[in-house]
């Protein structure tokens, strides 16, 4: 571990990449030195606060080490400090990985609505979660959120999304009803 730390420190000095703080912190964590690890993790997140362009690199480094809360905080700070950055997708998936499925659903649906070109990516991620959902708890939560959105906004987008969900659940009659309502509005 000491050799690894020396190597990481020398690489950090040569390249001045704050992503090495994540590696150094993880090395300390493996040595059961959580205080030292947290110190390095804080330095990595502080680097994002000072230079938001590092957010993706450092967020990914945290994700690769399964440090989900730190990754979420990194993306959040990067997005807050640079409004042109959008990490809503990554943050939504992290919420799902942390077990906050309802929050993930809301964030993914918001993201797909504001970035229509990414709807297919969002749907693919939702399918992955539905495949692991033997009791349909996740699918029912998704359906509930989509039904609320179709009632609140009357936007065809939500009817199309709901139709997609029904097709994935092999509820073709319900999907057909959604498609008919879309057709009548056009």
Describe each PLM feature range:
Residues 10-11, 43-44, 77-78, 111, ...:
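Canonical positions in the second alpha-helix
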Residues 31, 65, 98, 129, ...:
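Structural motif corresponding to the intra-repeat A-B loop/turn of tetratricopeptide repeats
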